[in-house]
Amino acid sequence: MKVLLVQPAHPSNVRLFGRVYMSSLTLPVVAALTPPDVEVAILDENVAPLDLEQPADLVGITALTPNAPRAYAIADAFRARGIPVVLGGVHPTLVPEEAAQHADIVVLGEAEGVWPQVVRDVERGSWQRFYRGEKPDLRGLPMPRWDLLDNRRYFPVPKMEASRGCPFNCTFCSTTAFFGRQMRYRPVEEVAAEIRTLDRRFSAVFITDNNIVGRPDYARELFQALIPERITWIGQASLTIAYDEELLDLAARSGCHALLIGFESLSPEGLAEANKKVNQILDYEEAIARIHRRGIAIIGCFVVGFDHDDTSVFARTAEFIERTRIAIPQVTILTPFPGTELRERLLAEGRIWDFDWSHYDATRVTFYPARMSPEELQEGYNRLVRRLYSYPAIVRRLLHACSYLGKGVVGFFPTNLVYRRLGQEALRYRPQPSSAGKGRPAQVRPIPLIVDR
């Protein structure tokens, strides 16, 4: 039996120096879960054109919201040849009935516990329409099959995970809808063992946990275990790490090079709307300074388009980023992803006008904002992108970062270029608001499923 695992092209795919910015962790993990007697290959359309005529007995396709239309097109092409297709990932989980129109099987949730059964059921010629993965225990996970990727086609930043879930419940984020709010952790010794298997030619490891300091006692144990590994790593954390000096010092000693931190909004009203309560009591500028003093750079995430945002939000956001010298700003437009509280509210208010999933890349306006027009939000975002990602602005940020990163600052130039490229794509987009019902697909909400059909 031969299984093809397909990563569809992402509309925001960026290449630099002939390489894709980062590889996906999803398909190497699914490949590792495939029964060992089954031949498996990974096809990443972001690095090479996809041959839709390849022989296969089963095709598995993962999809996020922005590349869901492409995933559906690929699925339709393989099904037209009589090959069973499985759709899985965040987007199919949150709109399973929509995904089922393009697949023989839809996997809801995480793959552990169900993927081997899917493969065996297809091998027997008898399968279910839907398989629901439970929240698996993270002990004993197999090592991702990085050997199935041509790693020369990606930047040398492998991904790994130490935990899943997020204790926060931001209204615009689909993470909790997919992984849940209950944090689950891998044994620290297994994380360290996986690091030892990685090709040491990498420049840094990206730890994909949504909040690596979600449980401080676990984070301390993890950071202590990373110190002897002598690696450089990048992770995601809540801003609360700035106020735990012991934990912050340990992160720096363990090789933390940068932290992606969700500031989301500069206004208390915006934070309340996002349900980011933890940020409401923190002094952003003091927290940033504390992190910088440890030699850790910040990838700062900001969202524009909340109901309390007016056209002044763009200048205020730019001025804050410039004043605090955040090394890598990541500014996005509020986007009503499926499975989120935000989407349910905007649908109920009749404010979503764009139902083309390929536009849901967080650089394009898809709804009617409260205090400005869609055109004003898009144009303001475009101005903000031009200001933050001009070459002089990038150089100024990185020159400042030299004071606490030293020569390590060189690694942040390509990342800034990635966001510059993404912003340039958005500059060509012009929103075309229509009636909020026009073009609306029949199925836009997750619905309860009976999975034993």
Regions found by a protein language model. Give the residues of each.
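Structural recognition of alpha->loop->beta junctions
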Residues: 98-116, 199, 250-260, 316-331
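Structural detector of well-ordered beta-strand residues that form the stable sheet scaffold
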Residues: 86-87, 107, 130-131, 234-236, ...
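Acidic, low-complexity intrinsically disordered segments
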Residues: 1-200
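Radical SAM enzyme core and accessory elements
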Residues: 2-5, 39-42, 150-152, 341, ...
